[in-house]
Amino acid sequence: MLLRFRGPDGTVRIAVEANETFGQLGDKLLKLLPENLDPRTLTLSNAPSGGEVKLLMEIARAKVSQIGLKNGDMVFINYKLLDNLPNGNSTTSTSTTHSSHLTSSTNRLNGSAVLPESIPVNVPAQAVTSPSEKIKNPWEVVQQSDLDNRLDKKDGKIPRKRDTKMCRHGEKGMCDYCMPLEPFNAQYLAEKKIKNLSFHSYLRKINSATNKPELGSSFMPPLTEPYYRVKKNCPSGHPQWPEGICTKCQPSAITLQPQEFRMVDHVEFAQASLVENLLVFWRSTGAQRFGYLYGRYEEYTEVPLGVKAVVEAIYEPPQVDELDGITLNKWESEKDVDEMARLCGMERVGVIWTDLLDSGAGDGTVICKRHIDSYYLSSLEIAFAARLQAKHPKPTKWSDTGKFGSNFVTCVVTADETGGIAISAYQVSNTAVEMVRADIVEPSADPAVMIVRSEGDDDSDTSARYIPEVFYRKINEYGRSVQENAKPSFPVEYLLVTLTHGFPSDPKPAFMAKNSFTIENRLVIGQEQDIKDVGKQLGLDKNGQLTQSSDGVLAVSDFHLLCYIYSMGILSKEEMALLCRVATQHDLADGYQLIATPGWANFLAILQSTG
């Protein structure tokens, strides 16, 4: 077949066989690309932008036929160029080294030989760098959120009143019975039934053990993200994996245990109508619905040094909804919606979807599928949540890599044990994120278990994947804690962190429009956003003037309306920023300033012309 490859330096055509590997294809491709190309950075994609991007080295052992390429297909490539090499230095030595590598069965953990065609694309030797990309002095260069900076300045101590029975001192004194407790005090957490430490409480706990200023030792970042992949450019001098491996570059065995902390403690929905809109769709169609949560992070005072995600809006991207699942389509306006959220002082904080099945009793009850004897979040959903958390890392100066975990949350609207509709909020552990990123685990047909991949699978490029030993501890039938091998599968609860959720007792939502604007991507139930609906939402008459029934500045206080106006492209960036300020802060002075702008006048004229 003939394949076309379009990149920064033009388009090339290569003839390949369906049974050839991408490693063989890469060797042909490199001959047609610039000589100073860095093969480590060569990526393939099915679209010029927004498509699925894969490093060539990651799929070097996959066959062309497995990817689904056909004769004449266009593949989009991208790469980076190396600095010009000095005279006399070339990559021939590297090529010679690759060709002379041993291919004995001892080079593969499962005993199979490393064939020449399965060797990765030749790459020039580079300086030894850490695969985890550690940052020197992260506390000087990493930009944390304002919330993290505020919590860092707090001591987090839990105050206690004077104990009338045990304290022998006066009102101004202090003893062991009334002195403030550390935010990670186990007894206090048990009394308050707090299952997981907050992130900043956990940070205080491990920092007190890692850094001891009284000893005069230099500061060390106390946080380290798990890393379960083979380290590249091992200083021991042996061939790179999969041809060679040693104890310095291979990951250690993994022992799964419940994560003792959570990055976010609570999810707060600013108003009940946010979730109700999802339920309206389910009641109309019986199909499930998915949405992205937009809001902000605030301090959560119910737990020591806690953090909560405050959800102000739910945006429903393009999707195909079914009775038992959801398929997400390509989201063209993703960057625009994120920009609108930023102008409103928000960010993407999580996802939410429904999993509801009517009981058929006619009383509004639903069937409870998620409970202690089945599962709470399926293995497929955990893998999905892990990928989303990996895309939204949390920047922190307390980690040697400048990031640690994620504040991204996952919510499911499902049935509780009484048949009522309830919300459950979760995160997956940092271990789960890295295991998914390292391709160690994969979802199972049984939603309650996660499968540990096998290194020698023939139907994928697992030959380049190192699978460390994975264990977990459980209580056996005799009440003893025993260690079990996680292969071939293990329970998903070892990867799950449970959050609390709720609604404010005194709601003060940012978006307060009395009449909600049509929600996007609901054409399947006959709802479509239209420019005429904008005039109705704003309370305009046929002449483009505000009617007496207009809600004033509150009329524009709707996130879906703002996104639609932004998509029209009429207002400038400054005018959109002003509109978002009016929508979220509800200031009349800003409203009059918006009305006086030329962009708003053009906008009203367009509304008037469309009737």
From Swiss-Prot:
User: Low complexity bias: where?
Assistant: 90-106
Q: Give the intrachain disulfide bonds.
A: none
Q: Name one GO biological process term.
A: ubiquitin-dependent protein catabolic process
Identify its membrane topology class.
Peripheral membrane protein
Domain MPN spans what residues?
267-404
Its annotated compartments are: Cytoplasm, Perinuclear region; Endoplasmic reticulum membrane; Nucleus membrane
Keywords (A to Z) from UniProt = Cytoplasm, Endoplasmic reticulum, Membrane, mRNA transport, Nucleus, Protein transport, Translocation, Transport
- Annotated region (Disordered) at 89-113
Has keyword Cytoplasm? Answer: yes
List, alphabetically, the GO terms of the cellular component aspect. endoplasmic reticulum membrane; nuclear membrane; nucleus; perinuclear region of cytoplasm
Which coarse location class describes where this protein primarily resides? cytoplasm
One term of GO molecular function: ubiquitin binding
Q: Which PANTHER family match?
A: NUCLEAR PROTEIN LOCALIZATION 4 (PTHR12710), NUCLEAR PROTEIN LOCALIZATION PROTEIN 4 HOMOLOG (PTHR12710:SF0)
- Give the family, as the similarity comment puts it: Belongs to the NPL4 family.
Task: Describe the function of this protein.
Answer: Involved in the import of nuclear-targeted proteins into the nucleus and the export of poly(A) RNA out of the nucleus. Has a role in the endoplasmic reticulum-associated degradation (ERAD) pathway.
Protein name per its UniProtKB record: Nuclear protein localization protein 4
Per the UniProt entry, what species is this protein from, by scientific name? Sclerotinia sclerotiorum (strain ATCC 18683 / 1980 / Ss-1)
Q: What is the lineage of its organism?
A: Eukaryota, Fungi, Dikarya, Ascomycota, Pezizomycotina
Gene name, Swiss-Prot/TrEMBL: npl4
